[in-house]
Amino acid sequence: MPKRDLPWRSMAGTSKVSRNANYSPRAGIGPRINKAAEWVNRPMYRKPRMYRTLRTTDVARGCEGPCKVQSFEQRHDISHIGKVMCISDVTRGNGITHRVGKRFCVKSVYILGKIWMDENIKLKNHTNSVMFWLVRDRRPYGTPMDIWTVFNMFDNEPSTATVKNDLRDRYQVMHKFYGKVTGGQYASNEQAIVKRFWKVNNHVVYNHQEAGKYENHTENALLLYMACTHASNPVYATLKIRIYFYDSITN
């Protein structure tokens, strides 16, 4: 028995509607991709030969795997006078967190945590910014210099810090960032998340000592300087700092 023609078949100018049509109001909402984005995110086989053959390797040049990691977890009391810590302290050994010999390359640095104020300070109406500097010390000696010795500041303000002219050859600022917290009874922002990941490719050299200390560095120590801009209200920073490094093949 043939099917009966439905009323919409006899109407002029109508077309059959698919059952799979999506009438959801969200159907037309989605990420718009233009030609520029498609070109930037094009697959590797559509790129020139130079991009396909000259890709950087995961292992740093002159090094060998596996990728090792060292973590520094600490709560810091950051004041206006600043603080410094060495993040290239790696003890000599055979573990996944140790260096095999004198030389290794820090491939990348990962900083994760937050800056926050205590109960008494967060009730005061003020804004405080915490400045961070990742510095490479090319010729480390003795103990790390404090922030006032390395940086030149106008009116004792850490936000205007630049490396002193006579120390520019030794200290090199690799990265710089800041986090801001605000105190008060109403529109307060008492804590701020800190999250940074950098590729540094820093080749560190130790002496014959096994302990991972700043005084045992001979070349390219990594230092993290911290200071807040408010003179009377300190800030706390709970940070986990991880360095990913490879041992040198010349050890």
From Swiss-Prot:
<protein>
    <recommendedName>
        <fullName>Capsid protein</fullName>
    </recommendedName>
</protein>
<comment type="function">
    <text>Encapsidates the viral DNA into characteristic twinned ('geminate') particles. Binds the genomic viral ssDNA and shuttles it into and out of the cell nucleus. The CP of bipartite geminiviruses is not required for cell-to-cell or systemic movement.</text>
</comment>
<feature type="short sequence motif" description="Nuclear localization signal">
    <location>
        <begin position="35"/>
        <end position="49"/>
    </location>
</feature>
<keyword id="KW-1160">Virus entry into host cell</keyword>
<dbReference type="GO" id="GO:0046718">
    <property type="term" value="P:symbiont entry into host cell"/>
</dbReference>
<dbReference type="GO" id="GO:0075732">
    <property type="term" value="P:viral penetration into host nucleus"/>
</dbReference>
<dbReference type="InterPro" id="IPR000650">
    <property type="entry name" value="Gem_coat_AR1"/>
</dbReference>
<dbReference type="GO" id="GO:0043657">
    <property type="term" value="C:host cell"/>
</dbReference>
<dbReference type="GO" id="GO:0039615">
    <property type="term" value="C:T=1 icosahedral viral capsid"/>
</dbReference>
<keyword id="KW-0238">DNA-binding</keyword>
<feature type="short sequence motif" description="Bipartite nuclear localization signal">
    <location>
        <begin position="195"/>
        <end position="242"/>
    </location>
</feature>
<keyword id="KW-1163">Viral penetration into host nucleus</keyword>
<keyword id="KW-0167">Capsid protein</keyword>
<keyword id="KW-0479">Metal-binding</keyword>
<feature type="zinc finger region">
    <location>
        <begin position="63"/>
        <end position="80"/>
    </location>
</feature>
<dbReference type="InterPro" id="IPR029053">
    <property type="entry name" value="Viral_coat"/>
</dbReference>
<keyword id="KW-1140">T=1 icosahedral capsid protein</keyword>
<keyword id="KW-1048">Host nucleus</keyword>
<feature type="short sequence motif" description="Nuclear export signal">
    <location>
        <begin position="96"/>
        <end position="117"/>
    </location>
</feature>
<keyword id="KW-0862">Zinc</keyword>
<comment type="similarity">
    <text>Belongs to the geminiviridae capsid protein family.</text>
</comment>
<keyword id="KW-0946">Virion</keyword>
<keyword id="KW-0863">Zinc-finger</keyword>
<dbReference type="Pfam" id="PF00844">
    <property type="entry name" value="Gemini_coat"/>
</dbReference>
<dbReference type="GO" id="GO:0003677">
    <property type="term" value="F:DNA binding"/>
</dbReference>
<dbReference type="GO" id="GO:0042025">
    <property type="term" value="C:host cell nucleus"/>
</dbReference>
<comment type="subunit">
    <text>Homomultimer. Binds to single-stranded and double-stranded viral DNA. Interacts (via nuclear localization signals) with host importin alpha-1a.</text>
</comment>
<keyword id="KW-0945">Host-virus interaction</keyword>
<dbReference type="GO" id="GO:0008270">
    <property type="term" value="F:zinc ion binding"/>
</dbReference>
<dbReference type="GO" id="GO:0005198">
    <property type="term" value="F:structural molecule activity"/>
</dbReference>
<feature type="short sequence motif" description="Bipartite nuclear localization signal">
    <location>
        <begin position="3"/>
        <end position="20"/>
    </location>
</feature>
<dbReference type="InterPro" id="IPR000263">
    <property type="entry name" value="GV_A/BR1_coat"/>
</dbReference>
